[in-house]
Every structure is written in C-alpha cells, then in structure tokens.
UniProtKB/Swiss-Prot annotation:
GO terms for molecular function: ATP binding; catalytic activity, acting on a protein; glycine-tRNA ligase activity; transferase activity. Its main location: cytoplasm. Belongs to the class-II aminoacyl-tRNA synthetase family. Tetramer of two alpha and two beta subunits. It comes from Streptococcus pyogenes serotype M12 (strain MGAS2096). Keywords: Aminoacyl-tRNA synthetase, ATP-binding, Cytoplasm, Ligase, Nucleotide-binding, Protein biosynthesis. It is found in: Cytoplasm. The lineage of its organism: Bacteria, Bacillati, Bacillota, Bacilli, Lactobacillales. GO terms for biological process: glycyl-tRNA aminoacylation. GO terms for cellular component: cytosol. It catalyses: tRNA(Gly) + glycine + ATP = glycyl-tRNA(Gly) + AMP + diphosphate. This is Glycine--tRNA ligase alpha subunit. It is an enzyme of class 6 (ligase). Pfam families: tRNA-synt_2e (PF02091).
C-alpha cells in the first residue's frame, strides 16, 4: 500500500465504491445499538420481498467491551461500515474484494481468508450463514447471508457485509493502537474518542443506576407493545433498540443473573418478532412499492387467494 488513507478517507472511499455498485447511502440511525445489523436499514429491510441496497456507517455501542481507553483494540463504541444487498448479488465476494483494492489492499499480495463463522443474534431472532474475513491474520469483516430475521425466513436472501473500520484503519495505517489512527489530517482517533471511551466505561461499570435501568427496561418494553397495538412499527422498533441498549448496560454492570439474562433476551426477541411481522404486513398494505410491477402483482394476487 502506498498512500495511507485517513479514517475518514476510508469511509469516503467505501461510500463511493458501494454507491457505484447501486447502494443508497444512508446515515447512521439515531438510537443506541450494538451493531449495524440492528439499524432498521438492515433489520427491517432484510425481511419481506422488496429489494434493498444500502450502505452506511454505524457507530456501535457495546458497554461490556469498554476498557476505560486502556486497551488498544477493545472499545465501548466502535464504527462499522455496513453494506446490505437484497437480493444478494451472485458476485458479492468479488465485489467485496474489489472494495479492498479501492482501499489500496491488493488481494493478490495479501493472505485473505474467508473463515466460516455462522452468525446469530438471539435478541432479535436473527441468524444466517456467515464468514469472517481475515486479512493477514486479523479479522476485518463479517460476511453474512441472512436466513432468518426477526424470526421470519428471508426471501430473497439478503447479503450483509460489515467492515470493522477501526481494525481496517489500524491495518492500513500500520498502527498498533486504535487511538493512534489518523482520523483526519493531523487529528488522531484518541484525540476525539479517548475521553468519551473512558467516561462511558466508568459509567457502564461503576456509575449507572441499576434501579433506574431496570425501571426503564419495563417502560420501554410496555411502550413498544403499545406502539405495536397501534400498528406503529418504527416507533415500536425504536423502543426495542432502547430495551436492547438498556439490557446491555445492565449486563455490563453485572445486574442480571445468568437466568435473568436469558429472560431479558427472550423479551427483546419476542418484541422484535412482532415488529418484523407487523412491518411485513404494513408493507403489503402499502402495495410493496419498491417491487417492480410484475412481481408486485403476482405477490399481492397470491395474498388475495
């Protein structure tokens, strides 16, 4: 690699590349979440028959992974670059490898391996066939073909490509610590994110009010159910995300036992499944507007029979 791209140049390069492949460029969704997969731009759009091609950066919060800014690679919040394509292109792996070339990584000059790692997200009732992508011994991407989302079988299959931007940038810039990554010319990653990383870690592990979080979970769960009773999918899903993040804070604090943990995950999963079913039903009421006319007519006619 000749030119070492800054963090923001990596994002811009990936945005331009996937835009050229027909992906819409979405913006990060304004709710805490543990992964880009949980954005409605993936979770909701991966279900149902309508096509969907999108790419976006998603800041992802994982309270239990916080290390007070003392670990060079483990973070409370990291950034993912998420690509979802439905139906999955037959050449999605080739498209991915070409994206690495755009970043200055020639696949012929590096050890790039697709290591089987089937994916599952119990809290959203989602699963799929997957691979980790290893670049010279370091995982940089997760590849997934969704088989189930929100408890529903996916048809057509959605392909998801999730780049770990911090790992990718560490490799490209040849630094050992994420805090040494150059975010923009003359500005280091640590100068932006080290203090928030420390503060969020301290809050997650030491300061958070467990009683308040437990109460909030109950309130968010009830409000999600109330919104669903009114057929309001998107507000309901916002509260599912709030439930998920609140649970993650409780888990990081050690406030839930092993048995309770399974119970909380099941409660979130049950809500996510109702959201998924309601979303599909609402899209059908709208006439599946993203489908071509011929396919739409066939599917809607089948529902009428």
């Amino acid at each position: 690699m000749s030119k070492k791209l800054t963090f923001q140049e990596i994002i811009l390069t990936l945005q331009q590349y996937w835009n050229d492949q027909g992906c819409m460029l979405m913006q990060a969704y304004d709710n805490e979440k543990g992964a880009g997969t949980m954005s409605p731009y993936t979770f909701l759009r991966a279900i149902g028959p309508e096509p969907w091609n999108a790419a976006y950066v998603e800041p992802s919060r994982r309270p239990a992974d916080g290390r007070y800014g003392e670990n060079p690679n483990r973070l409370y919040q990291h950034h993912q670059f998420q690509v979802v394509m439905k139906p999955s292109p037959s050449n999605i792996q080739e498209l991915y490898l070409a994206s690495l070339e755009k970043l200055g990584i020639n696949p012929l000059e590096h050890d790039i391996r697709f290591v089987e790692d089937n994916w599952e997200n119990p809290s959203t009732g989602s699963a799929g066939l997957g691979w980790e992508v290893w670049l010279d011994g370091m995982e940089i991407t997760q590849f997934t073909y969704f088989q189930q989302v929100g408890g529903l079988a996916t048809s057509p299959v959605t392909a998801e490509v999730t780049y770990g931007l911090e790992r990718l940038a560490s490799y490209i810039q040849e630094v050992d610590s994420v805090y040494d990554i150059e975010w923009a010319p003359g500005v280091k990653y640590g100068e932006i994110f080290l203090q928030p990383e420390y503060e969020h870690s301290k809050y997650s592990f030491e300061i958070s009010d467990q009683d308040m979080l437990l109460e909030n979970f109950e309130k968010f769960e009830k409000e999600a159910s109330r919104a669903l009773e009114e057929g309001l999918v998107h507000p309901a899903y916002d509260y599912v995300l709030k439930c998920s993040h609140t649970f993650n804070l409780l888990d990081a604090r050690g406030a839930v036992s092993v048995t309770e943990r399974a119970g909380y995950i099941a409660r979130i999963r049950n809500l996510a499944r109702v959201v998924a079913k309601t979303f599909v039903a609402e899209r059908k009421k709208l006439g599946l507007p993203l489908l071509d006319e011929a396919t739409r007519a066939i599917l809607l006619a089948e529902d009428d029979e």
